[in-house]
Amino acid sequence: MPDKFKRVHVIVMDSVGIGEAPDAAKFGDFDVDTFGHIAKHVGGLKMPEMGKLGLSNIREIDGIKKAEKPLAYYTKMQEASNGKDTMTGHWEIMGLYIDTPFRVFPDGFPDDLINQIEEKTGRKVIGNKPASGTEIMAELGEEHVKTGALIVYTSADSVLQIAAHEDVVPLEELYEICEFCREITLDDPYMLGRIIARPFVGEPGAFVRTPNRHDYALKPFKPTVMDALKDGGKDVIAIGKISDIFDGEGVTESIRTKSNMDGMDQFIAVLDKDFNGMSFLNLVDFDALFGHRRDPQGYADALVDFDGRLVEVMEKLTDDDLLIITADHGNDPTYSGTDHTREFVPLLVYSPRFKNGGSELELRKTFADLGATVADNFEVKMPEYGTSFLKDLK
């Protein structure tokens, strides 16, 4: 390719897998297919923009026509790392191989961990289940205020959260408790991605979180492509939970989002900025609101809504832009349980510069090929892991 792209935009549709990975059984997953099963469930998906890019050329999806002349280069990527969680997927996309998976606790944390927290703090633990923070605060907040017990909960991700009223557990104490939890969960058997302090105030029936949240994350164990870009003087604009996933490493600007649609609003606003580097967007609602909750209809509606926003995105792209759409794992809402699913993820790569459209790329054996391509484009330090496909984009 003659000239490099000035801007690369990566959109991660969180959990939008495109069919069972060859090693899915090792992860307890059988006949999983997020995109395919959602499309079947609703009698076909209406996603004309993704269709034009070449989504059904990767493999046929009910309701989405195969493009005769796809606008994008297309293929699917296979995860190499030993995990199927958000952090593993994103870290691999940016050039790391993860051998030990981060742990998730869909049934709450083991007694041994809870006992350690109770012994260290002298406080009982209540909750200990996956929950929405606002819901568990409403459910257990009054008991917490009366007894001083700690509200401990998790989510579908690798996280331990502790909610406490600021008048019951002073902030300093809450932070110390979270630091202790961070220390004891760095390795197996817990290996948690993040500990979060969730302070709140108010009266029963009217509890509200305060801005004093504090995250104790794991930093990536090696520099990622984002670090290479930042060190090379390039912009790395993280939108949504990207900055949290990388604990701020390699990020030059972080933009928070409230929802998928807000994420698309923020992303489209970033397209109007003059920058040289990468924008990196995570759309978490697919996973958090519909995948884990096993809601195929809601998931389908969210996919259709996303597709509708691509019209605005495409209008703003120039020959200096490269758009990459992918996912970080699967989360088949028609499958049993509530966990992620081990799947291939789609890869669509588009630029208005491709005057003759795109074509099929080789199957990628690791998500890290995406990061390697970004590094190659900006001529920064290449990751140890991953092979660039930049030269295949004509």
From Swiss-Prot:
InterPro entries: Alkaline_phosphatase_core_sf, DeoB, Metalloenzyme, Phosphopentomutase_DeoB_cap_sf. It is found in: Cytoplasm. Its EC number is 5.4.2.7. Its cofactor is Mn(2+). Its main location: cytoplasm. Coiled coil: none annotated. Mn(2+) 1 binds at D14, D328, H329. This is Phosphopentomutase. It comes from Listeria monocytogenes serotype 4a (strain HCC23). The gene is deoB.
